[in-house]
Amino acid sequence: RIASNRSPWLAGTQVGDIYTVPVSHGEGRFLCSDELVRKLAANGRIATQYVDENGVPGMDIDVNPNGSVWAVEGITSPDGRILGKMGHSERIADGLYKNVDGRYDMKLFQSAKEYFNI
């Protein structure tokens, strides 16, 4: 789910949009203190979160496959120009996931191309 679209990478999204993103990692998760995660949230730096089908972040393995704090899937730098995320948004193509419903294309690369004038 898009938690904040303050980053140019997420300019093509709306807060609350839900995307299905491939997850392919055996290790790693977002960890930080409660104080820091609250500060990140207050500053709009939590970009994306793992959510259930109703858009609610959770800690259940079916929702949050790696146990990330606050179900954080992605964060940004203070200016939003750097986006770090766990899911593989680059692993999409038309018809690739025929048996999995959902929206896949967050337009990350299109938005970045437009912002950075590439």
Model region roles, listed by residue range:
Residues 1-118:
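Amide-donor transfer/coupling interface in amidating biosynthetic enzymes
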